[in-house]
């Protein structure tokens, strides 16, 4: 991703002597010096122009034309441009590439300015500070995050402070964590842009757009002061962050940077949430990836848990649902309140509620743009129409003494009468897209604007009336009153009627066959009419800006309404999903353990015709399940579905199971699948061991641990020894709820040593030379792994399968004779004479006469007689070979 540094304040020497440049280029270079690592979009008329190296870079990234025009300092001016009315599409492309763009507008009046029109950078568009609807994903929050590190006291590890902001939503959050936890938190938050000093950014592995700031931006005292100013308080004690020094340092840098990019204060950032690791069920990077919450293992958006659940009626709901899935809560009270609300919704008319919600606009983002004074006319009309429908939403929210959450939402959705009335009076029913086009402010809102519009709109009728009066007054029947852009309004009289022209006519233009005149009355009207449209647009722009200011005091209530609508949408969506997918309400209890009855994998179930539901019981006397069975038998699916049911329960959703009783959970760990990290210089086995080590260090008795085929990637004895030791450690030290899938059948002896371990297996049956997977979890260990049958299904050549069968038979016989599994040298010759056939089978063999004859037969082209003859020939060849 692109990196940016803090602005410098001096002209780059590469541009040569400053006084050798033209006045306009001097203006540009001053602006560019404040944004040296940012593309500068310099407004010139209907285009944003880029110059010098910015032009070259933009031409390459945007595939636009690079040209030269004029000279400055004796050199051609390299330039490229984009039309201002289509700038959003170019900004979107640049931001996706990790670039930042400074938008430089004309703020002076060309009519009264000598030299270059005054310009200034009005905002800086960076990956983390997007506010335009065209640049934002509807269903993903866009976060700007700052990281600050404070040295630990007395040799302790440094404190890492995080502050992150959803700029358009106005949500500010803080937390502190350890350095080793940083990447996990970045994976959870997934910011679009990170701010930090050099040393901190160099230690960040997360792939993200980065902006480097000097160390002094991350000052604790300055950060605390900036945060108090932002929140309008004298103390931060009430927010619980006064002692979070590293987080305060990060917050100060974050708020200053965000305000600088917008060129104004952040009026809508009026609250603060302090997060603690203990609030949420811990999900590390591997777990989020393996459970495919919002992205598949291949990096696709579907099929995932989010894509299955997201039938939300609003974009606000989709964003909140995504947040909930990544933040399951440890405290049972909140998910239980959500589940109770879902139950009440299911008993009512949730379909009508969802229908109404679909008609609403994105109040959260409109409110953010309103706070930044960048809301467009249709934002305001959408906001007005949404506020008008709040009573309908409230009526459709069922009220119950058993669902306090729904009551809270009902109260939060009271219509703000003053704001709604103001929008109704001020904004047209269907306003123009941009205020510069006019047609935004409603008639009757401002008398001066109405008068100017009347002049402009009644211009045609005035000219018709004037023409009729002048014909009658002068007796010139073919007199015409007209207008053109060069000469304005005029009265045209043919040369043959010139003698009838009154004295008050003043000649304006002479043509070959006619004269054009102006009268005092027409001149007065011309002055008024020609300026009326410009004055109306100017007046409308002023009124619109004033309207935005008048709406600012309503920001807190609008933010509350946005949050309530999003939550109502998610709850109604989860109710719809529970109904459509036949999910049930889980029971969250104090007693440790997990008991799932006929549980299903929520996503896989939708991808197959028939899904086999399974039970899963983990309790104090049954902490670890050793899962054996064939590849493709469903072990990984069984493990993942258990984790997803637990996660959904603590999100507050219903779950894909007939019944679920789940005790306290603090973390979910997964060690599933095989993948290397070539960029990081780590093999598949190293990645596996690194993830296993993290689990062994961090898992607690309330953690859910999924371990899939641990120990592969090394020799048989090494892998088996590691798998045995890891399973024992999880039982004796971590005591976590553990699902441990393995192909090491020796591990099935573990329950003999630990009473809290139990064997289960995924069943399969052989059918002829093939295998049928039953996908049913049954008690006890599997009888075999069916590896050869799976290899055959995969299309492994038959000679290889035959050789493997013989080798397997010898290995099993050797194991039975010695009571041990041999540590094999795969490159050694067979040590048993009976295995010569296996070695022979593995080598290429000359085709037999019978095989050659079979290869030469084309059954589709044979007559019945030909087929009978061929059968006799094959029988003869078979007898001869025998």
Swiss-Prot record:
Gene3D superfamilies: 1.10.1420.10, 6.10.140.430, DNA repair protein MutS, domain I, MutS, connector domain, P-loop containing nucleotide triphosphate hydrolases
GO molecular function, one term: mismatched DNA binding
InterPro entries the record matches: DNA_mismatch_repair_MutS, DNA_mismatch_repair_MutS-lik_N, DNA_mismatch_repair_MutS/MSH, DNA_mismatch_repair_MutS_C, DNA_mismatch_repair_MutS_clamp, DNA_mismatch_repair_MutS_core, DNA_mismatch_repair_MutS_N, DNA_mismatch_repair_MutS_sf
Top-rank taxon, per record: Bacteria
BP GO annotations: mismatch repair
Entry GO CC: cytosol
HAMAP family linked to this entry: MutS
Protein name (database record): DNA mismatch repair protein MutS
Species assigned in the record: Ralstonia nicotianae (strain ATCC BAA-1114 / GMI1000)
């Amino acid at each position: 991703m692109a990196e940016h540094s803090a602005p410098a304040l001096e002209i780059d020497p590469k541009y040569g002597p400053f006084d050798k440049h033209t006045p306009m280029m001097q203006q540009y270079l001053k602006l560019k010096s404040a944004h040296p690592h940012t593309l500068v979009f310099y407004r010139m008329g209907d285009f944003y122009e880029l110059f010098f190296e910015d032009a070259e870079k933009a031409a390459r990234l945007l595939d636009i034309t690079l040209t030269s025009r004029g000279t400055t300092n004796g050199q051609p001016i390299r330039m490229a441009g984009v039309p201002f009315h289509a700038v959003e599409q170019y900004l979107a492309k640049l931001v996706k590439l990790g670039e930042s763009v400074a938008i430089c507008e004309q703020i002076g009046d060309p009519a009264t300015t000598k030299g270059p029109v005054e310009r200034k950078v009005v905002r800086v568009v960076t990956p983390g500070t997007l506010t335009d609807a065209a640049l934002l994903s509807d269903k993903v929050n866009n976060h700007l995050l700052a990281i600050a590190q404070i040295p630990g006291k007395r040799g302790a590890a440094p404190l890492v402070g995080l502050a992150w902001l959803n700029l358009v939503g106005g949500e500010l959050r803080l937390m502190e964590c350890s350095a080793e936890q940083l990447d996990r938190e970045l994976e959870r938050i997934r910011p679009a842009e990170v701010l930090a000093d050099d040393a901190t950014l160099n230690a960040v592995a997360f792939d993200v757009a980065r902006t480097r700031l000097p160390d002094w931006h991350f000052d604790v005292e300055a950060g605390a002061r900036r945060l108090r100013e932002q929140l309008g308080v004298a103390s931060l004690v009430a927010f619980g962050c006064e002692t979070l020094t590293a987080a305060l340092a990060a917050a100060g840098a974050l708020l200053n940077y965000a305000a600088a990019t917008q060129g104004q204060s952040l009026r809508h950032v009026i609250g603060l949430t302090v997060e603690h690791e203990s609030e949420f069920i811990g999900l590390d990077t591997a777990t989020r990836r393996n459970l495919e919450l919002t992205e598949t293992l291949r990096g696709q958006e579907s099929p995932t848990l989010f894509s299955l659940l997201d039938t939300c009626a609003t974009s606000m709901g989709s964003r909140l649902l995504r947040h909930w899935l990544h933040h399951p809560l440890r405290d049972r009270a909140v998910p239980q309140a959500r589940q109770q609300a879902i139950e009440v919704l299911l008993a009512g008319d949730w379909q009508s509620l969802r229908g109404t919600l679909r008609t609403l606009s994105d109040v959260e983002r409109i409110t953010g743009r309103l706070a930044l004074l960048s809301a467009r006319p249709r934002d305001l009309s959408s906001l007005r129409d949404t506020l008008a429908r709040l009573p309908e939403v409230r009526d459709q929210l069922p009220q119950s003494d058993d669902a306090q959450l729904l009551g809270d939402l009902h109260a939060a959705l009271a219509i703000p009468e003053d704001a709604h009335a103001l929008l109704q009076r001020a904004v047209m029913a269907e306003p123009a897209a941009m205020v510069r086009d006019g047609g935004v402010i409603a008639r009757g809102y401002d008398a001066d604007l109405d008068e100017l519009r009347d002049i402009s709109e009644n211009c045609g009728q005035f000219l018709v009336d004037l023409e009729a009066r002048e014909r009658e007054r002068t007796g010139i029947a073919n007199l015409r009153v007209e207008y053109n852009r060069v000469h304005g309004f005029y009265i045209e009289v043919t040369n043959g009627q010139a003698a009838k022209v009154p004295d008050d006519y003043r000649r304006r233009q002479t043509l070959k066959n006619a004269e054009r005149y102006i009268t005092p009355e027409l001149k007065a009207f011309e002055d008024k009419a020609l300026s009326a449209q410009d004055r109306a647009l100017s007046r409308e722009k002023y009124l619109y800006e004033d309207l935005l200011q008048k709406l600012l005091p309503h920001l807190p209530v609008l933010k509350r309404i946005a949050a309530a609508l999003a939550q109502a949408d998610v709850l109604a969506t989860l109710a719809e999903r529970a109904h459509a997918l036949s999910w049930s309400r889980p029971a969250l209890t104090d007693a440790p353990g997990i008991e799932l009855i006929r549980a299903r994998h929520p996503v896989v179930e939708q991808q197959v015709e028939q899904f086999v539901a399974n039970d899963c019981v983990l309790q104090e006397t049954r902490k670890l399940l050793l899962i054996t069975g064939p590849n493709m038998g469903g072990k990984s699916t069984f493990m993942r579905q258990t984790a997803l049911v637990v996660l959904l329960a603590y999100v507050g959703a219903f779950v894909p199971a007939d019944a679920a009783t789940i005790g306290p959970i603090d973390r979910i760990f997964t060690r599933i699948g095989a993948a290397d990290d070539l960029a990081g210089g780590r093999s598949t086995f190293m990645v596996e061991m690194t993830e296993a080590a993290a689990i062994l260090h961090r898992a607690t008795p309330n953690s859910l641990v999924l371990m899939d085929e641990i120990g592969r990637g090394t020799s048989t004895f090494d892998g088996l020894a590691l798998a045995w030791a890891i399973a024992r450690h999880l039982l004796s030290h971590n005591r976590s709820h553990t699902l441990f899938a393995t192909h090491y059948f020796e591990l099935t002896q573990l329950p003999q040593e630990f009473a809290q371990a139990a064997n289960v297996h995924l069943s399969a049956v052989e059918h002829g030379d093939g295998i049928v997977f039953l996908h049913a979890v049954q008690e006890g260990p599997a009888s075999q792994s069916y590896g050869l049958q799976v290899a055959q299904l995969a299309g492994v050549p038959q000679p290889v399968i035959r050789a493997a069968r013989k080798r397997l038979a010898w290995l099993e016989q050797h194991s039975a004779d010695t009571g041990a599994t041999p540590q094999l040298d795969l490159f050694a010759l067979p040590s048993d004479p009976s295995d010569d056939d296996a070695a022979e089978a593995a080598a290429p063999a000359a085709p037999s006469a019978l095989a050659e004859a079979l290869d030469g037969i084309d059954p589709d082209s044979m007559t019945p007689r030909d087929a009978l003859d061929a059968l006799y020939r094959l029988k003869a060849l078979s007898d001869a070979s025998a």
